[in-house]
């Protein structure tokens, strides 16, 4: 082993790393480890400084932005293999000193993980130790995580078709609905409880989410007094255990001259909801069902319990508390109604991260799967078998409802672009094993003519990596329309739909190529600039196809000046009636229906405005 003195040279480590790539990983790690042992006279500060300088030097070399990004990853990997504890400091300092990103982004992305803030530097170091910077992994990372410094790499031409039997003739047709025998399913999503919501705090803040103790507007020249004659809803109100609304004492929010816009009792459009707004939304569901003598067979919740605040204000304790409080409130309000849930990208700590079970880092996240599974089983939403599976498989599960529908819940952090662990071995089709689980469940259901709903958080058309999206489309094509009866998402906070077509490219988006549709639910959180909303579906009892959706909302701005009274929740629209599409009454609102709607939205200003209104 060569012993170096003086300045620690990263190029030598990088050379060792490249050589080690030709041999088994352990040989490379041992070589690098031996090298560091031979330089034991060097302090951590010396090593850190040398790596920082090496990263900084890349900008002065005759290299493309892409090559610089790839080389940064390679340099980082050489350090992560032997001293992962130094990676966060090296990259945070480099990022701040060079102005690569904003200070907040540098710190949240590269600083070491702690329970006090949702920083991801330790996860970044884990990723570096596993990934191949010179191949698809590095190209993918530099495109998605580094603002397209590299061109988007070509998606690997991989198939999972060897995991299912050939598609029989009958599987190309959807079963015929019963006609008028239906039941109702509630769909709620994206609560994002803001535990530190403060009445009277800044609702017009300069950065990120507002209405917190730390919310500020950088321009201090304004005053909230202009709202004094307009807004009057500043009461410390609550709901009693029996559900009774209690309007509490009035808070004089206009004493604080530094506030531009004081946060009202029920929330604001630039904030996540206080618990009282979440309870109001759940109460509105219960009250409507009583008023209309409407019964729900079950509910689906498509994720996100934790707020959208900056990661430096998001800690482990509040993540756990948010998950426990929201599920407790759902159980208290919906009582015995089964609720089938998914984990959102905010429902983990650190934010958005999830590691594969079999590569050394999954223990960081097992606590969360155990907590979720415990809550779901304690509230009798899952049986023991399903909850045990969820504990060991990233909160994913399958369960059969009383009417015979199978529901498959998936953890979408598996394909999330902000999950560092999704960027190593990224050319492999199923490093988490979740697609294998999904396929096995679909094959089993197809064999016994059982219909299936798939629920998850992040739609594949938004924030998903390309290879998982490709494989998902392949799976949906194989098992539609015979087995997959419905696909449901959250995440966007908007009332949307996602049509899946056979083939690829814009030329494939024809009515003949329609495979299925994904229902994307609006959110209870008003962040950002949305009215709190929820929906329910009427579902055919025979086929479990969605026959209609009914959408409800409250005009949050009306609560700013209603003297602290409860929000008024209103019916907004029926998906079948609103778009006035020629469509048989006995046919479900399937992908073909939504293709017709999409064509109208694309070609008609009137329909485009209608869609925007909803």
Sequence positions of predicted segments:
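Acidic, His- and aromatic-enriched active-site or binding-groove loops in soluble protein domains
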Residues: 319-333, 361-382, 477, 481
